[in-house]
UniProtKB/Swiss-Prot annotation:
TNFR-Cys repeat copies, ranges: 43-82, 83-125, 126-166, 167-195
Entry superkingdom: Eukaryota
Extracellular side of membrane: 30-210
Protein name: Tumor necrosis factor receptor superfamily member 1A
Occurrences of domain Death (ranges): 362-447
Cysteines engaged in disulfide bonds, as pairs: 44-58, 59-72, 62-81, 84-99, 102-117, 105-125, 127-143, 146-158, 149-166, 168-179, 182-194, 185-190
Species of origin: Sus scrofa (Pig)
Encoding gene per record: TNFRSF1A
Stretches that traverse the bilayer: 211-233
Domain notes: Both the cytoplasmic membrane-proximal region and the C-terminal region containing the death domain are involved in the interaction with TRPC4AP.
Gene Ontology BP annotations: apoptotic process; cell surface receptor signaling pathway; cytokine-mediated signaling pathway; defense response; inflammatory response; positive regulation of inflammatory response; positive regulation of transcription by RNA polymerase II; prostaglandin metabolic process
Length: 461
C-alpha cells in the first residue's frame, strides 16, 4: 500500500523536504561542501602553510625580510626563501612570492622620515616637533602646527594625533582652535561664550590700560634718572656738589687753573720760624709790618698759583725825611746773618740740625707752595705721603681755591709728620727726585730774603 517506511526515519525526511522548499540556501549550508571538508582536513599549524599543489603537505613560512622563492618539496623539507631587494620589505612571516615596495613620505603633507625602509620594516613617516597628525584616511595624514593658545591657557598639551586644547581667557572665545576677542563675536554661538556686553569689553580694555600705564611711567622715570646721573657724572662742571654726592667722589680740578675765592681753613697759632739760624728781629719799630699768628680765617689770595716768591730788590727807595730807618742796624756785637744752608744731602747738612717745619710760619709754607709748579703739585704731595683721599678732602674743604688747598695739604703733611722728619731738607730731596732743581733754587732764594711774608691778598672779581 504505499512506501514502506523505517520507523524513526519518516519525520526527519519530512522536515528536510519542508526546509528545502522554504529555505534552500540554509539547508545547503547545513551540508558540508566537499572543498570545505578538504580545507578543514588540510589545516596546518602556526608558522606553516599548505602546499598549493598538495594540501596534505605543510611547508614552513619565510621569515620577515624574505619572500617565497620555491615551495618545499615534501614533508620535513625546507622552503626556498630569498632576501628582499633594496626598496622592498616584508614585515612578518609570509609565503609571498615577492616583497612589498617601501612607502615614501609625502612632503606636500609636511611629513618627514622618522626611520628609513629596511628589508624587514617599511618606512616610518611622522611630523616635526610641535606638530600633530591630522588623518584624511586610515594611512594618509597631514602634519599641522600645534596651537600656542594665544589669549588663553593650555588645557591639554599637543599630542601625536591631537592638537592642543586651549582654555580662553575672559573676554575671548574659541574659534577654529584659536582664542578670538569677543569684540569680533558676530553670531549666536559665540554669544553663549561671550555673555559680556560692550561695557564689560570696555572694562577689560581699561584693565589692560591700568596695568600697562604705571609700568610705562615707572620705566620712563628710571630711564630719566639714569640719564640725569650719567650727564651729571659726565659734565662735572655743571653741579660740583651734586656730582660729589651722586658719583661718590670729588669734582676734579685742573691743576694750574684759577679757582674762585673761598675762605681758607683756620690754623692754630704758628710760631715764627726763620731758616737763617743766626738772624733774629729786634724790638725796634719798623714800618714793615711783622707777621702775627693766625687766630681766625681771613681772605686769602687764590690766584697766586703761578707766581713765585721773588727776592726783594737790592736797592730800596730812601725813606722820607724825618722817618727812621726801615730796619735798624744790628749792634757791633750782633753776628752777621749767615746764608740759608742748601737743601743738600751732604754730611755737613745732615749734622747741622736741618730746618724743621713743625714750627714753620705760613710764609715758609707759601714759599714752597708758590715754588712748586701747579701741574706737579699732586705728584709732590703724593711723594710726601698724602693719600688720594686726603688730597680730595682738602680740595673739597677749600672749595675751588687751589692755592689754599695746596697750603692745607702742606700743613696736613707737616702736622702728621714728626718734628724730626718734617724738614726743609726732606722737601728739597723730593724736589730733586722730581727734577725740579730750578724750583728748589727759587724757594731757597725766596727764603733768604729779609721779609718772608705771604703776598698781599688779591680778591678775584
Amino acid at each position: 500500500m504505499g512506501l514502506s517506511t523505517v520507523p524513526g526515519l519518516l519525520l526527519p525526511l519530512v522536515l528536510r523536504a519542508l526546509l528545502v522548499d522554504v529555505y534552500p540556501a540554509g539547508v545547503h549550508g547545513l551540508v558540508l561542501h566537499p572543498g570545505d571538508r578538504e580545507k578543514r582536513e588540510s589545516l596546518c599549524p602556526q608558522g606553516k602553510y599548505s602546499h598549493p599543489q598538495n594540501r596534505s603537505i605543510c611547508c614552513t613560512k619565510c621569515h620577515k625580510g624574505t619572500y617565497l622563492h620555491n615551495d618545499c618539496l615534501g614533508p620535513g623539507l625546507d622552503t626556498d626563501c630569498r632576501e628582499c631587494d633594496n626598496g622592498t620589505f616584508t614585515a612578518s612571516e609570509n609565503h609571498l612570492t615577492q616583497c612589498l615596495s617601501c612607502s615614501k613620505c609625502r612632503s606636500e603633507m609636511s611629513q618627514v622620515e622618522i626611520s628609513p625602509c629596511t628589508v624587514d620594516r617599511d618606512t616610518v613617516c611622522g611630523c616635526r616637533k610641535n606638530q600633530y597628525r591630522k588623518y584624511w584616511s586610515e594611512t594618509l595624514f597631514q602634519c599641522l602646527n600645534c596651537s600656542l593658545c594665544p589669549n588663553g591657557t593650555v588645557q591639554l598639551p599637543c599630542l601625536e594625533k591631537q592638537d592642543t586644547i586651549c582654555n580662553c581667557h575672559s573676554g575671548f572665545f574659541l574659534r577654529d582652535k584659536e582664542c578670538v576677542s569677543c569684540v569680533n563675536c558676530k553670531n549666536a554661538d559665540c554669544k553663549n561664550l561671550c555673555p559680556a556686553t560692550s561695557e564689560t569689553r570696555n572694562d577689560f580694555q581699561d584693565t589692560g590700560t591700568t596695568v600697562l600705564l604705571p609700568l610705562v611711567i615707572f620705566f620712563g622715570l628710571c630711564l630719566a634718572f639714569f640719564l640725569f646721573v650719567g650727564l651729571a657724572c659726565r659734565y662735572q662742571r655743571w653741579k660740583p656738589k651734586l656730582y660729589s654726592i651722586i658719583c661718590g667722589k670729588s669734582t676734579p680740578v685742573k691743576e694750574g687753573e684759577p679757582e674762585p675765592l673761598a675762605t681758607a681753613p683756620s690754623f692754630g697759632p704758628i710760631t715764627t720760624f726763620s731758616p737763617i739760624p743766626s738772624f733774629s728781629p729786634t724790638t725796634t719799630f719798623s714800618p714793615v709790618p711783622s707777621f702775627s699768628p693766625i687766630s681766625s680765617p681771613t681772605f686769602t689770595p687764590c690766584d697766586w698759583s703761578n707766581i713765585k716768591v721773588t727776592s726783594p730788590p737790592k736797592e730800596i727807595a730812601p725813606p722820607p725825611q724825618g722817618a727812621g730807618p726801615i730796619l735798624p742796624m744790628p749792634p757791633a756785637s750782633t753776628p752777621v746773618p749767615t746764608p740759608l744752608p742748601k737743601w743738600g744731602g751732604s754730611a755737613h747738612s745732615a749734622h747741622s740740625a736741618p730746618a724743621q717745619l713743625a714750627d714753620a710760619d705760613p710764609a715758609t709754607l707759601y714759599a714752597v707752595v708758590d715754588g712748586v709748579p701747579p701741574t706737579r703739585w699732586k705728584e709732590f704731595v703724593r711723594r710726601l705721603g698724602l693719600s688720594e683721599h686726603e688730597i680730595e678732602r682738602l680740595e673739597l674743604q677749600n672749595g675751588r681755591c687751589l692755592r689754599e688747598a695746596q697750603y692745607s695739604m702742606l700743613a696736613e703733611w707737616r702736622r702728621r709728620t714728626s718734628r724730626r722728619e718734617a724738614t726743609l731738607e726732606l722737601l728739597g730731596s723730593v724736589l730733586r727726585d722730581m727734577d725740579l732743581l730750578g724750583c728748589l733754587e727759587d724757594i731757597e732764594e725766596a727764603l733768604r730774603g729779609p721779609a718772608r711774608l705771604a703776598p698781599a691778598p688779591h680778591l678775584l672779581r
